[in-house]
């Protein structure tokens, strides 16, 4: 590379957590290649499973979020891979989710208030308990519910859990702990590797 990195960035790279996916374009391509060569064949079967999804999912979200590769590059690579004909269902599952990514990004572009306001404005008036102790227990993985706590601790340690488990964390936060979703989303953005806002708390 013809340009040197600033010292501040080099310092941050040295402290990059070892349990996280390795950063950069070369690793983005490695994840794509290993998905198409082997990992992706069980994608459809493992997508919802907390443990198996760590291997069988595309794991492309950090590379897409940080701009290491584009949606188009990922889509074309998977669609044109020789194994596509052997694992069409699984590969099409990933391609569909790449399309969804574009769909939801466009929704945010069209209606950027989604980040801070309820889609259904009626929910803005809904009362929540939003108990600080419950919120803190959820954030630290100490709710007492094994799957919830395991997912939160895994997310904090590795920066990644599958979509279904992320959705489950938010559902528990809102419906079972009776907390306003706005009190939880920032925490998730701080610890998920795909979020450009991520900082080590």
Please provide the spans of the model-predicted regions.
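Secondary-structure transition/capping motifs at alpha-helix termini
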Residues: 81-86, 158-161, 179-181
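Contiguous, well-ordered alpha-helical segments that form the cores/surfaces of helical PPI scaffolds
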Residues: 58-61, 133, 137, 146-156, ...
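Acidic/polar loop patches that form or flank catalytic/metal-binding clefts of enzymes
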Residues: 43, 106, 163, 180-185
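Active-site core of glycosidic bond-cleaving carbohydrate-active enzymes
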Residues: 97-99, 105-147, 153, 163-167
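Secretory-pathway/luminal and periplasmic proteins that interact with or process carbohydrate-rich
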Residues: 104-109, 177-182, 194
């Amino acid at each position: 590379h013809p340009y040197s990195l600033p010292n501040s960035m080099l310092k941050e790279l040295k402290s990059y957590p070892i349990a996280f996916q390795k950063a950069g374009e070369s690793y983005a391509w490695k994840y794509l290649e290993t998905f198409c060569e082997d990992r992706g064949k069980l994608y459809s079967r493992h997508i919802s499973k907390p443990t198996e999804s760590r291997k069988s999912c595309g794991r492309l979200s950090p590379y897409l979020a940080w701009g290491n590769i584009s949606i188009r590059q990922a889509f074309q690579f998977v669609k044109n891979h020789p194994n596509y004909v052997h694992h069409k269902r699984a590969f099409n599952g990933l391609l569909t989710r790449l399309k969804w990514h574009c769909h939801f990004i466009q929704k945010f572009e069209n209606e950027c208030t989604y980040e801070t306001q309820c889609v259904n404005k009626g929910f803005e008036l809904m009362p929540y308990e939003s108990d600080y102790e419950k919120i803190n227990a959820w954030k630290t993985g100490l709710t007492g519910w094994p799957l919830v706590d395991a997912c939160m601790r895994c997310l904090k340690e590795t920066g990644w859990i599958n979509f279904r488990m992320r959705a489950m964390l938010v559902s528990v936060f809102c419906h079972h702990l009776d907390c306003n979703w706005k009190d939880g989303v920032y925490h998730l953005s701080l610890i998920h590797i795909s979020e450009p806002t991520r900082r080590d708390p």
